[in-house]
Regions:
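Phosphate-backbone binding interfaces of nucleic-acid-interacting proteins
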Residues: 1-111
């Protein structure tokens, strides 16, 4: 387990629901997808680069995802990742994306 975090740390994160509208191979050293995610009219679309290789690119398109949208951009090889899609590492080494269990409005905040 990680050390205890300050209670306000979680409150600083802006975690939103978005829908993957495009998933394609990223130009990175490790196998990675470049996903364009729609967060609704307030935030628009953002790009995330992630190692969700246990999914086919076409299977990611249309999927709702949970993402942190206020971490700033991160350089990943020649790609820029604007948001962090949250997921769980599974025993096979892949990552399973977290998603809401029902259809919620794009841009909804996770609380």
């Amino acid at each position: 387990m990680k050390p205890t975090a300050q209670p306000g740390s979680f409150d600083d994160l802006d975690i939103r629901i978005g829908r993957v509208v495009l998933a394609e191979e990223a130009r990175t050293r490790k196998p990675t997808y470049r996903m364009t995610i729609d967060f609704g009219s307030e935030l628009g679309t953002k790009v995330s680069c992630g190692a969700y290789r246990n999914y086919a690119a076409d299977d990611l398109v249309g999927r709702l995802v949970v993402a942190v949208v206020n971490l700033g951009t991160k350089q990943m090889g020649p790609e820029m990742s604007e948001v962090l899609v949250l997921g769980v590492t599974n025993p096979g080494g892949g990552t399973t994306a977290l998603e809401p269990d029902s259809d919620v409005p794009l841009g909804s905040q996770v609380s």
